[in-house]
Swiss-Prot record:
It is found in: Nucleus speckle; Cytoplasm; Nucleus. Residues 54-122 bind DNA. The keyword Amino-acid biosynthesis does not apply. The gene is SRY. Keywords: Acetylation, Activator, Calmodulin-binding, Cytoplasm, Differentiation, DNA-binding, Nucleus, Repressor, Sexual differentiation, Transcription, Transcription regulation. It comes from the Eukaryota. CDD domains: HMG-box_SoxA_SRY. It comes from Balaenoptera physalus. Belongs to the SRY family. Residues 32-52, 169-204 are annotated as: Disordered. Interacts with CALM, EP300, HDAC3, KPNB1, ZNF208 isoform KRAB-O, PARP1, SLC9A3R2 and WT1. The interaction with EP300 modulates its DNA-binding activity. The interaction with KPNB1 is sensitive to dissociation by Ran in the GTP-bound form. Interaction with PARP1 impaired its DNA-binding activity. This is Sex-determining region Y protein.
Length: 204
């Protein structure tokens, strides 16, 4: 079931040593597959340094994908790591249960050895840092302030609780500015008529 390929020993004993020495040789394992959830874990409160962290034991997919990933990467040097992961995930699903069985057995053996070596180990997934501010659809105060600035320049669609107040404020402002606008619009006409009459008197 396990053989030497390209000068590398893939026996169960060597694989176990590689899995437990992951911190010393991280290139031996590939754990970036989205479905594997094989992330760095700790046996304590999650605040230990990188050297004290205990890795999860490899699952069947990781046991299988180590050699396959190296093979695909050599055959397709231009392929991105994410694309390799997608391809490996698809190929793994295409395997029959009989083909997967040896890797499940090896993963079970690795879990037993991991349990003996770290009896107090508990899986603690890392939590993503919460965003300080959640993205919400148009806050009322922000919307009102934007409308207050832009209401005289751009047409605006009113939303939320500030719509009525802003509309009434705009109407009152327009009603106050309308006479001024009318007067200002008449001034150029009166000025032109006065200039025309003055020019006519000079000619006559």
């Amino acid at each position: 079931m396990f053989r030497i390929v390209n000068g590398e020993d893939y026996s169960p004993a060597v694989q176990q040593r590689n899995s437990l020495d992951f911190g010393k040789a991280p290139s031996l394992l590939w754990t970036d597959h989205g479905g594997s959830n094989d992330r760095c874990e700790t046996g304590g409160n999650g605040r230990e340094s990188g050297q004290d962290r205990v890795k999860r034991p490899m699952n069947a997919f990781i046991v299988w994908s180590r050699d396959q990933r190296r093979k695909v990467a050599l055959e397709n040097p231009q392929m991105q790591n994410s694309e390799i992961s997608k391809r490996l995930g698809y190929d793994w699903k295409m395997l029959t249960e009989a083909e997967k069985q040896p890797f499940f057995e090896e993963a079970q053996r690795l879990r037993a050895m991991h349990r003996d070596k770290y009896p107090g180990y508990k899986y603690r997934p890392r939590r993503k840092a919460k965003r300080s501010q959640k993205l919400l659809p148009a806050d009322s105060s922000v919307l009102c302030s934007r409308m207050h600035i832009e209401e005289t320049l751009y047409p605006f669609t009113y939303k939320d609780g500030c719509a009525k107040a802003t509309r009434s404020r705009m109407e009152s402002r327009l009603s106050r500015s309308q006479p001024t606008n009318t007067t200002s619009s008449l001034l150029p006409q009166e000025h032109r008529s006065s200039w025309t009459s003055l020019s006519h008197n000079r000619v006559t």
